[in-house]
Design a protein with these regions (language model features):
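Conserved alpha/beta enzyme-core scaffold
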Residues: 1-374
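N-terminal low-complexity segments that are often proline-rich with Ser/Thr-Pro
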Residues: 376-379
Length: 379
C-alpha cells in the first residue's frame, strides 16, 4: 500500500487510506504508511514516531478514543463502513474459522463488518495456539446483557473468529516475527518506582483497604510497568495474583514461571520475540494460564469494576489536584493517545499512575501545580 501510494503521488494522483487498528502497530504498518503519506485517517492509538509527526503536522486525521469503545463505535456506524479487513492468523479453515495469533484487538468486529477479508497466515505462530483465545462480542442495545466474566480465567466465547468464507478473498502466507519493541533497561529510578508501588500495596493490605487475598492487576506497558510487576512479584507480602489487562508483557510471563502470577487475561501478548518463542515452545504450560480476548472485553469498564482491579498506568504529567495528562506533550503535541488507561482507571478499585519526577534529562518536570493538558481527572 505504501509503494502504491508513493507511485500515485509521483504521478500527481491522490492516494490515502483510512485505517482502524486494535492499538499501536509496528513500523512496517504505521511507519511505512506514514512516510508514504498514505494515511488519511487513523484511530485509536499509535506509538510510531513518523506517524506521530504526521498527526501533529495535521497531515493525517486522528481520532483518540478509549480502546474499549472502538468496536462498538464501528458497529454503531459512527465511523463509516469497512471495505477490507486485513487480519493475521495462525490458522484458517475452509468453513471460515480464523484462529488469531498473539493479539485479538478488534478482529471479530472488523471481520464481520468488512466487505472483504484478506488473511495473513503467519507460520511463526503455531496452529496449536488455538484455545488460547476467547472470542466474544456483546449484543448491541437494546439487547445487550452483562458480560459474564466474574474471574479473569472465565471463558465466555469461542476459540476462533467465525466468518462467512465467501468474504475471504485472499490468504497470504508469511513468516514474519512480531515487531516487539525493546524497553530501556531498568535503572535506579524505575526500580524505586516499582518498590514504592509494591510497598504501598502491602500497606493497603495491612490497613484492610485491600483484601488479603488480593485482587486482579492491570498494568500498562513499558520499563516502569515491568519494574512495578517485578517488585510486586519479589515482595512476599503480596500473594500470588491474577492479571486482567490489555497487554501482557515480559514481566507477567516471568512471574508466571515463578508461580507469582496465577493467570493472565489480556488482548495481546506484547512480549519480546525471545519470550514469544518460549511461550510457543511450552504451550502445555502456558495454554491454561493465558487468555486473549477482544479489546472490547479485555478493556471493558464493566468488567474492570466487577473484578475490582488495581490499575497501574503511566502518565506524562500529573498535577497536585490529581489530574493526569497521558496524551499531550506540553499540552499541545499528541504523543501516543489515551489507549486503554482510561478504560481501566475510571473503573478500578484502586488506580495508580506512575512516572519519573523529571523527563528529557531533567529538563522538564512531570509533577506540576496545574497540568498543561487534562486527559483524566483522577481524584
Amino acid at each position: 500500500i505504501a509503494r502504491k501510494a508513493a507511485e500515485e503521488h509521483a504521478k500527481g494522483n491522490p492516494f490515502q487510506i483510512g485505517m482502524f487498528t486494535g492499538a499501536s502497530t509496528g513500523d512496517k504498518l504505521d511507519g511505512e504508511l506514514a512516510r508514504a503519506n498514505a494515511i488519511k485517517f487513523r484511530t485509536p492509538y499509535q506509538s510510531n514516531k513518523d506517524l506521530r509527526a504526521a498527526l501533529n503536522a495535521h497531515q493525517a486525521q486522528y481520532f483518540d478514543l478509549h480502546l474499549s469503545e472502538l468496536a462498538q463505535s464501528l458497529r454503531y456506524g459512527f465511523l463509516g463502513k469497512i471495505d477490507v479487513a486485513i487480519v493475521e492468523a495462525a490458522d484458517v479453515t475452509e468453513d471460515g474459522e480464523i484462529v488469531p495469533t498473539s493479539g485479538v484487538g478488534i478482529l471479530p468486529t472488523i471481520c464481520r463488518m468488512a466487505d472483504r477479508i484478506i488473511v495473513e497466515l503467519n507460520c511463526r505462530h503455531p496452529k496449536e495456539i488455538r484455545g488460547m483465545h476467547d472470542i466474544y462480542e456483546p449484543a448491541d442495545p437494546p439487547l445487550r446483557r452483562e458480560i459474564p466474566i466474574y474471574t479473569p480465567s472465565d471463558r465466555i466465547g469461542n476459540d476462533c473468529v467465525k466468518v462467512d468464507p465467501a468474504k475471504i478473498v485472499g490468504v497470504v502466507r508469511t513468516d514474519e516475527p512480531n515487531e516487539g519493541g525493546k524497553f530501556s533497561p531498568l535503572d535506579d529510578v524505575t526500580m524505586a518506582i516499582g518498590k514504592n508501588v509494591a510497598d504501598f500495596l502491602v500497606s493497603e493490605i495491612k490497613a484492610g483497604r485491600l483484601p488479603k487475598e488480593f485482587v486482579p492487576l492491570q498494568s500498562g506497558v513499558g520499563n516502569v510497568a515491568n519494574a512495578v510487576l517485578g517488585c510486586m512479584g519479589a515482595n512476599e507480602s503480596i500473594p500470588a495474583f491474577n492479571v486482567y489487562t490489555e497487554v501482557i508483557q515480559d514481566a507477567v510471563i516471568e512471574l508466571m514461571k515463578q508461580g507469582r502470577v496465577k493467570f493472565a487475561s489480556g488482548c495481546s501478548l506484547s512480549v519480546s520475540n525471545e519470550v514469544i518463542r518460549e511461550i510457543y515452545a511450552n504451550l502445555d504450560f502456558f495454554k491454561d494460564k493465558i487468555l486473549l480476548r477482544p479489546q472490547e472485553i479485555s478493556n471493558n469498564p464493566e468488567v474492570a469494576r466487577r473484578l475490582g482491579l488495581i490499575a497501574i498506568n503511566t502518565a506524562l504529567e500529573a498535577d497536585i489536584f490529581g489530574n493526569i495528562n497521558s496524551t499531550h506533550v506540553s499540552g499541545t503535541r499528541m504523543m501516543n493517545g489515551i489507549g486503554g488507561s482510561g478504560d481501566f482507571t475510571r473503573s478500578a478499585m484502586l488506580s495508580i499512575f506512575t512516572t519519573p519526577s523529571t523527563a528529557k534529562e531533567g529538563k522538564t518536570v512531570s509533577y506540576t501545580h496545574l497540568r498543561a493538558h487534562e486527559t483524566l481527572r483522577h481524584l
